[in-house]
Amino acid sequence: MGSCRFCYVERDARRYQRMKQPKFSEGFNLTLHEHCLDEPLTEFKGGRVFVCPMSDVFHERVPSEFRDRIMEVTRKAPWHTYLLLTKRPERMAEYFQTRKVPLNVWLGTTVEAAEYKYRIDILRSIKGSFKFLSCEPLLGDLGELDLTGIDWVIVGGESGFKEVRPMKEKWAMNIKEQTDAQGVTSSSSNGDHTAETVYGEEVNTIMDTFKW
């Protein structure tokens, strides 16, 4: 996938493995941490939980039973809001065909280039209370966007490598103009100077509140 080319996740996973961090003993290999799923139950002050930020819950190798456990926790700890972000919205849609999306679960998909705009339609087809797009890393102009049913859009460039593909300000501005026109909340990703130029004070008004 285009946005995965210089992703920080594999680099960080291997670094944490070298640092002997228990959760990363397998490096970048897919590992299910069942013992971590109940952590939100011990935090009683409500917050936003980014579920599996260094992975994809809807990866083909993640069993539905593991997703069921995650959904169980979201219901047991309804004082938190949980964000599920995927590059595989078709698998997300298939999963929720036979399951109700809890009101405190936000569903999102990554749209880093125009060729992936089809994911928006798939996300829109899922019955959920809150849906968002992550246009990060933004690798090109997305053109015209239909944001019907979308509640939030995050915009950011690639980060973490010397050979990062730069995001052009006009690409971010195109998204901001359309979110403003369609009444959709949008913000830039933390530390992205190009996006900050476009979004100014709107930077991370939502994302800064994450707990995990």
Please report, for each region that a protein language model flagged, where it lies by residue:
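Structural preference for beta-strand elements that scaffold enzyme active sites
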Residues: 48-50, 81-83, 104-108, 130-134, ...
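Auxiliary Fe-S-binding modules of radical SAM enzymes
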Residues: 16, 128, 139, 143-212
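Conserved Radical SAM active-site core
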Residues: 1, 5-105, 113-117, 142-143, ...
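A general structural detector for well-ordered alpha-helical segments in enzyme core domains, enriched
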Residues: 66-70, 119-123, 171-175
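Noncatalytic carbohydrate-binding groove/subsite architecture in carbohydrate-active enzymes
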Residues: 104-109, 117-133, 141-144
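Acidic, His- and aromatic-enriched active-site or binding-groove loops in soluble protein domains
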Residues: 104-112, 206-212
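Histidine- and/or cysteine-centered catalytic micro-motif in compact active-site loops
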Residues: 87-89, 110-112, 136-138, 158, ...
